[in-house]
Structure formats: structure tokens, C-alpha cells
């Protein structure tokens, strides 16, 4: 991130309670640091050996809907105050969630993820995304636990 760029906080979202908590936390942090948010969701085609996956499912559309619902859920508490001014953009991609997050956060000021995923995209997560990004990210990483966990 260059000195003239607005700070960006990248947040991994998968629809799980933990990722929504991460997004809520990131909104508060963005308000404190005059940063914007990029909410990121990634998906894979299901991997079932010997069983074809349904070709009538639009995974990109499903991911986009999950991301939009997560942003709304996290934004409900920010109708007033400094959090209301936080700009949130979204990014949907096909690929391994950890790699997509690492790519998107290469120039970010912060990467925020939940401690547990496996929301509506359990089949897309092949391992511990939070563990992978904490070891490989080029920016600071914050891992948020779901308060109800």
C-alpha cells in the first residue's frame, strides 16, 4: 500500500457466524482508521469423485448472495455513528479461499478472518483458511472468534 492510498481492510466471508463477526469487527476498525472494507468470498466446484456435481447450480451467484447477506447482517448495527460511513466493496472469486484472500490482501493494511468457517460453503474449504493466511499473508492478520462459539 502506498502512502497516498486509502487503507483497505480485506475480510474473508463465507456466511458463517464467525465470518460475520469478523466483518463486524472490521467495520469498527475501519471507522477508527479511516479505512475501507473489501469483503471477499471464494468458492470451488464441489469435489466428489465418481459423482458428478449438479450443473444447474450457479456457484458464483450463490457466493454473491451469501456475501450480500453477510454484509447486511454485519451492517445492521452500523446505521449511525462512525461505522455508518465505512465504505464496503465486495469481491467474489472461484478458487481456494486462502489463496484468494492472500492475493486480495497483498496491498491491504489488514486481513481479517473468522476463526471457523464452513458456513454455506463448507465444501469449498479444504483446510484451515485462518491458519494458512496467518502464516503466509504479507500484511497483519486478525482472527476473530464468534462470540457464540
Cite the ranges covered by each PLM segment:
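Small/aliphatic-rich secondary-structure junction motif
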Residues: 2-53
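Short, solvent-exposed amphipathic alpha-helices that sit
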Residues: 25, 62-74, 100
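General small-molecule cofactor/ligand-binding pocket signal
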Residues: 38-40, 89-93, 142-144
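Acidic, proline/glycine-rich short linear motifs
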Residues: 40-69, 91
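Gly/Ser-rich helix-loop-strand patches that form or flank binding pockets
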Residues: 104, 108-149
Amino acid at each position: 500500500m502506498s502512502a497516498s492510498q486509502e487503507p483497505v481492510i480485506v475480510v474473508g466471508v463465507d456466511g458463517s457466524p464467525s465470518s460475520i463477526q469478523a466483518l463486524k469487527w472490521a467495520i469498527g476498525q475501519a471507522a477508527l482508521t479511516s479505512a475501507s472494507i473489501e469483503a471477499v468470498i471464494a468458492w470451488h466446484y464441489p469435489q466428489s469423485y465418481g459423482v458428478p456435481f449438479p450443473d444447474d447450480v450457479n456457484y458464483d451467484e450463490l457466493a454473491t448472495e451469501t456475501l450480500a447477506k453477510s454484509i447486511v447482517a454485519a451492517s445492521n448495527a452500523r446505521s449511525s455513528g462512525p461505522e455508518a460511513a465505512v465504505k464496503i466493496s465486495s469481491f467474489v472469486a472461484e478458487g481456494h479461499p486462502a489463496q484468494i484472500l492472500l492475493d486480495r490482501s497483498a496491498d491491504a493494511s489488514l486481513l481479517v478472518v473468522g476463526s471457523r468457517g464452513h458456513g454455506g460453503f463448507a465444501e469449498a474449504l479444504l483446510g484451515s483458511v485462518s491458519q494458512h493466511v496467518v502464516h503466509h499473508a504479507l500484511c497483519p492478520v486478525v482472527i476473530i472468534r464468534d462470540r457464540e462459539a
